Amino acid sequence: MEEFQGYLELDRFRQHDFLYPLIFREYIYALAHDHGLNRVILLENVTYDNKSSLLIVKRLITRMYQQNHLMISANDSNQNKFLGYNKNLYSQIISEGFAIIAEIPFSLRLIFSLEGSQIVRSYNLRSIHSIFPFLEDKFPHLNYVADVLIPYPIHLEILVQTLRYRVKDASSLHLLRFFLHEYSNGNILIILNKSISIFSKSNSRLLLFLYNSYICEYESVFLFLRNQSNHLRLTSSGVLFERIYLHRKMEDLVEVFVNDFQGILCFLKDPFIHYVRYQGKSILASKDTPLLMNKWKYYLVSLWQCHFFVWSRPGRIYINQLSKHSLDFLGYFSSVPLNPSMVRSQMLENSFIINNAPKKLDTIVTIIPLIGSLAKAKFCNALGHPISKPTWADLSDFDIINRFVRICKNLSHYYSGSSKKKGMYRIKYILRLSCVKTLARKHKSTIRAFLKRLGSELFEEFFTEEEEFLSLIFPRTSFTLRRLYRGRVWYLDIICMNGLANHE
C-alpha cells in the first residue's frame, strides 16, 4: 500500500497553491494575449529551488513578461458592458489569464516530478509519431484491439470537481465556476459533436486545460489500477504527463480505488495489455482472449460512470481481431494483416514446403478524407479535381508558390510513415496543379502557356528535403532511390496533427 501511495502522491507542500493573488498581476494578462508565447520558456526555467512559493512564481512571470513585450489594446466596438467594462474583451482576457495561472503550478510540478524520477526530458517523446514505432514493435504480437472513444463530461461542474482534486484554492475554483456559467449563458450542459468547446475559439485555452485535467485524472487512475493488477510500474507513462503538462494523481484517490476495485483487479491481470491515446480516442490491445478485453471494457464504463459521472455505453468500445481490423488513428489506417509466404527447402532427396505468415504493421494514408479536407480548403472540388485558390490571387508569385510548397511539404512530412506512397502522389498532384491554376488566374493566362514559360522549375519547388537529399546521392531512375522513397520514416519533431490530416 505504501509503494502505491508513493507512486500517486503529490508533495504535500505543493498541494495548497493559492492562485487568486496572481489574478491581480497585470503581467498575466499581457502573457495571455501574447499568442506567440512558447510555454517551453516555463519548462526551461528549472533552476529554481524545488520548494516553490508564490514569490518564485511571481518572479518567473516577471521574467517571462520581460521576454515578451506586448501591449494590450482595449479598443473594441462592442458596447455590451460587463462590470463597467467591455464584456467580451475583458472576460476573455481574465479567462485566458486564469488559464495561464492554473498551468504554472502544474508545469512546475511536472518539472520536479521528472527530476525526482530521473527521467530524461526529451522533446522527442512528445512527438505523436513516437506512437507508431511502439505500435510496430508491439502490435504484430497481439491478437485483439479495442477502439475506445473517451466520453466527454456533459456538465461543466464535472470539470470543476475534477480540478478540485489538484487545486486547493477555493477562491480560484469559485472564479472558474463564474467564468463557465458566464460563457455558457445559463446553459451548463456541454453539447459535444466535434469539440468540447461551447465557447469561442479565443477561449479554447481554458477549456483545453480543463479537458486535459479531466483526461489526466482518468488516466492516472486507469494506469494506477493497471499497474497494480500486474504488480509492475509502467516506465512509459511519464511521456503522457509530459505531453499534456500535468502531473500524477493525488494520494486521496488511492484509498478510494484500492478499496472499491480490489475485488475486480484479480480478473484483470494481463501483462500484455497496451494502452495508447491521442486526444479523445484511445486504443487497448491485448494478446489474451476476448473475454479479458470485455472485462476491461465494462470496467472502463463503470469507472467513467461511477467516479467521473460521465455517461458512457459499452457500445462505444469496439473489440475486434487485430488481423482483420483497421484502426483509424492519427490520420492513418493501421492494420496487422497476415502476409503468407511460401519457402521451398530441400534436404538430400526430400523437399519441404514451408508456409509462413508473418505479421507486420501497415500504415496507409486515408486518401478520401484527406481529399475531403483539401476540398473544404478550396484546393479541389469534391471529386478531387484541382481548382484555383482565388483568395490567394492577390499575393505575389513567391508567396503563392511558398504557401503551396509549405502545405505540400508539411503533408509529406506528416505522412512519411505510410506503407504505400502512391496515395500521396495524388495529393501532391492536386496541390501542384492548384498552384499552377492560381498563378495562371492571377496573370490571366492559360495553364499550358504558364507551364511552358516556367518549365520544370516550378515543380522542383515541391520536392521535400528528403527527396532533394536523396536525388543528389542517387540517380533519379535508380532502384535504390525508389526503394528509399517507399520506406517508412517516423519523425520525432511532430507534436500535433496536421490541420488537413485531422478529419474529425
Curated annotation (Swiss-Prot):
Pfam families: Intron_maturas2, MatK_N
Keywords for the protein's UniProt record, in alphabetical order: Chloroplast, mRNA processing, Plastid, RNA-binding, tRNA processing
GO cellular component terms given for this protein: chloroplast
Chief place of localization: plastid
Single GO MF descriptor: RNA binding
Cellular compartments annotated: Plastid, Chloroplast
Entries under InterPro entries matching the protein: Domain_X (IPR024937), Maturase_MatK (IPR002866), Maturase_MatK_N (IPR024942)
Domain of life: Eukaryota
Biological process according to GO: mRNA processing; RNA splicing; tRNA processing
Family of the protein in this entry: Belongs to the intron maturase 2 family. MatK subfamily.
Function: Usually encoded in the trnK tRNA gene intron. Probably assists in splicing its own and other chloroplast group II introns.
Name of the protein in question: Maturase K
Organism: Betula papyrifera (Paper birch)
